[in-house]
Amino acid sequence: MIIKVRVIPNSKRNEVVSRVGSILRVKITAPAIEGRANEELCDFLSDFFDVKRSMIFLRKGERGREKTIEVLGRLEEELNEVLDTIP
């Protein structure tokens, strides 16, 4: 499943803030320096979607705040159920 994510780095804690249409807004504690926020985002999303870290792929947006993430390892219906819990 492909997910669009807008990252907010340097936050107090890692959390999914909201979902605006098909875009997730995610706060990450790591700074946007040398890919640290990207790594922490992938780690956080693997926990959030309950998949292995190796099943999360950053497909686009390595240097920007808007990212395209691919999540594998679970059925799309299961991932949609997780997404539906977000306000």
Swiss-Prot record:
Domain of life: Bacteria
Cellular compartments per GO CC: cytoplasm
Family statement: Belongs to the UPF0235 family.
HAMAP family: UPF0235 (MF_00634)
Protein's UniProt name: UPF0235 protein TGRD_618
